[in-house]
Swiss-Prot record:
It comes from Maricaulis maris (strain MCS10). This is Adenylate kinase. Keywords: ATP-binding, Cytoplasm, Kinase, Nucleotide biosynthesis, Nucleotide-binding, Transferase. The lineage of its organism: Bacteria, Pseudomonadati, Pseudomonadota, Alphaproteobacteria, Maricaulales. Residues 126-136 are annotated as: LID. HAMAP family: Adenylate_kinase_Adk.
């Protein structure tokens, strides 16, 4: 099963993704983690990633897709993949659909974690304080939310047209959200 965990910064994607990995044995495909790992590994692809990132540039969709492609056999063997932080644009979603289709599989479900903006801001401010991120001010966090709603949220209609979006209330406890995700994954 291939699922996309979707929602704004602070909605709990990373937390719930790690939980699904622990409970179901699936592979988490977090683009941020994959970029850092590729860079640290020093492979040819990793050196390309490092050069791009060191130049202050965004890594292209093609390279991100290449990183995902490298991990798909592992995900297949594990029985599933959790896409966390990808796709972020319709172009990336189309590329992911094609990549999976070429391998005889697909995105099975898109779990949209719904959390109101004020709760998101509170969570992110708290996380910034706990993790010592002085740059994550409330203004910066609100800007990140604006970017999400402007650039990433338009993916919901893309996947909704395919009948794959399942909304889950992300306002509860971690256990309540996990139960909501489990129920959504059982829906056909």
């Amino acid at each position: 099963m291939n699922i996309v965990l979707f929602g704004p910064p602070g909605c709990g994607k990373g937390t719930q993704s790690k939980r699904l990995v622990a409970e179901r044995g699936w592979v988490q495909l977090s683009t941020g983690d994959m970029l850092r790992h590729a860079r640290a590994a020093g492979t040819e692809l990793g050196r390309r990633v490092a050069a791009i990132m060191d130049g202050g540039n965004l890594v292209s969709d093609a390279i991100v897709i290449e990183l995902i492609e490298e991990r798909l056999p592992e995900a297949k063997a594990a029985g599933g993949a959790i896409f966390d932080g990808f796709p972020r644009t319709v172009a990336q979603a189309q590329a992911l659909d094609q990549l999976l289709l070429d391998r005889g599989t697909q995105v099975d479900s898109v779990i949209e974690l719904k959390v109101n903006d004020e709760e998101l801001v509170q969570r992110l401010v708290k996380r910034a304080e706990e993790e010592g991120r002085p740059d994550d001010t409330e203004d910066v966090i609100r800007k990140r939310l604006e970017v999400y709603y402007g650039q990433t949220a338009p993916l919901i209609p893309f996947f909704a047209q395919q009948g794959k979006v399942k909304a889950v209330d992300g306002m509860g406890s971690m256990d309540e959200v996990a139960a909501g995700i489990a129920a959504a994954l059982e829906e056909k």
